[in-house]
């Protein structure tokens, strides 16, 4: 069951950010193949309009990616839901998110009661995301660092969600995945990417599965303030 968020009036929304509009988004996601009810309830509950610029708030509950500045985007809700649904299948408790961005994916995971660690290379985006987490009463642990390194001090993780695409799965992140854990990440270049899930079995063996074609911004090294 999704924990109740401490929502302020502006979080609940009216008009194009109202509960009715959110319910319509959830039904579209359900029709597009998202089946996990906890995931759908988190999408219904977390106020996506607070994670984007106010000028775009009327589009917050469209099933589309939107710009958040610094050449980055808030992911399409279907993609967020599909990645969340995939990691929930292994019943995780502790999750690493690589690429905080607006904070929306991390908020979805936190709303599901998971222990969330998130890393972002762009300082300005991370500062904004932290404000949103505080506003919603979410205890998300965050770090300004190169996401390709992960956050090994708190590993291993039951699940890892990567929100930017690399040409191949990053070994440093795979190494932080616990036995029985699952990593979900976009893999590929600018012209072709796939959402891939990697599961580490009890014997340590790695199994991979392609979930869907996707389009993400690239996973870059280094840090920006």
Swiss-Prot record:
SUPFAM superfamilies: S-adenosyl-L-methionine-dependent methyltransferases. GO terms for biological process: methylation; protein modification process; protein repair. One of its GO terms (molecular function) is protein-L-isoaspartate (D-aspartate) O-methyltransferase activity. Keywords: Cytoplasm, Methyltransferase, S-adenosyl-L-methionine, Transferase. Its main location: cytoplasm. The active site is at 75. It is found in: Cytoplasm. Its EC number is 2.1.1.77. The keyword S-adenosyl-L-methionine applies. One of its GO terms (cellular component) is cytoplasm. It catalyses: [protein]-L-isoaspartate + S-adenosyl-L-methionine = [protein]-L-isoaspartate alpha-methyl ester + S-adenosyl-L-homocysteine. InterPro entries: PCMT, SAM-dependent_MTases_sf. CDD domains: AdoMet_MTases. Catalyzes the methyl esterification of L-isoaspartyl residues in peptides and proteins that result from spontaneous decomposition of normal L-aspartyl and L-asparaginyl residues. It plays a role in the repair and/or degradation of damaged proteins. Belongs to the methyltransferase superfamily. L-isoaspartyl/D-aspartyl protein methyltransferase family. This is Protein-L-isoaspartate O-methyltransferase. It comes from Xanthomonas campestris pv. campestris (strain ATCC 33913 / DSM 3586 / NCPPB 528 / LMG 568 / P 25). The gene is pcm.
């Amino acid at each position: 069951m999704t924990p109740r968020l401490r929502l302020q009036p502006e979080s609940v929304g009216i008009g194009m950010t109202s509960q009715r509009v959110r319910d319509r988004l959830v039904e579209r996601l359900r029709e597009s193949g998202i089946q996990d009810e906890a995931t759908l309830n988190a999408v219904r509950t977390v106020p996506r309009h607070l994670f984007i610029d106010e000028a775009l708030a009327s589009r917050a509950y469209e099933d589309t990616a939107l710009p958040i500045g610094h050449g980055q985007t808030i992911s399409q809700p279907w993609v967020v839901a599909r990645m969340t649904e995939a990691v929930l299948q292994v019943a995780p408790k502790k999750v690493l998110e690589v690429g905080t961005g607006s904070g929306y994916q991390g908020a979805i995971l936190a709303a599901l009661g998971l222990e969330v660690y998130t890393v972002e290379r762009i300082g300005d985006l991370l500062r904004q995301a932290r404000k949103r987490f505080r506003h919603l009463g979410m205890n998300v642990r965050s770090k300004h660092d190169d996401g390709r390194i992960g956050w090994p001090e708190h590993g291993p993780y039951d699940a890892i969600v990567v929100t930017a695409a690399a040409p191949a799965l990053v070994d440093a992140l795979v190494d932080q995945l616990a036995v029985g854990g699952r990593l979900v990440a976009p893999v590929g270049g600018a012209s072709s990417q796939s959402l891939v899930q990697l599961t580490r079995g009890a014997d340590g063996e790695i199994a991979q599965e392609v979930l869907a074609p996707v389009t993400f911004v690239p996973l870059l090294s280094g840090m920006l303030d």
